[in-house]
A protein has these predicted regions:
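NTP-dependent nucleotidyl-transfer catalytic core
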Residues: 1-126
Length: 126
């Protein structure tokens, strides 16, 4: 798949639902306009059976990068899903998940992401 460098599409990607780009929107725009293929990654832990609305914007933006021809990776952490993420949890006990629970959670997450990200696209797969 060739890289789409249409400036209006890139401008929308960098402004719609985007608060900040690090190091800067200007630098990322220059790279996107150059036609250089990027690899964009989102990693997550399937600690529950469903996504929440807060995830949607990230996945919509990931799909926009994919539509422009960039390689996107939607990674679900197996081990980190099983042990739980301690970030901002203080001393709260974390429920340990079995491998089977994580596999089932991952399947439901992929089903929920499919309407937003074209994970089955043969030309530029996720």
């Amino acid at each position: 798949m060739t890289i789409d460098t249409t400036e209006s599409k890139i401008d929308e990607l960098l402004t719609r639902s985007v608060e900040e780009v690090i190091p800067s929107k200007k630098e990322l725009k220059e790279v996107l306009l150059s036609g250089q293929k990027l690899r964009i990654y989102i990693g997550t832990d399937a600690t529950g059976t469903s996504l929440h609305l807060g995830h949607a914007t990230n996945y919509i933006i990931l799909e926009k990068f994919r539509q422009l021809g960039h390689e996107v990776i939607f990674l679900v952490g197996d081990f980190t899903s099983r042990i739980g993420d301690p970030t901002d949890k203080g001393d709260a006990a974390r429920k340990q998940l079995t491998r089977e629970e994580v596999i089932e959670n991952t399947k439901t997450w992929i089903d929920q992401v499919k309407p937003v990200i074209d994970v089955d696209n043969a030309e530029n797969p996720v």
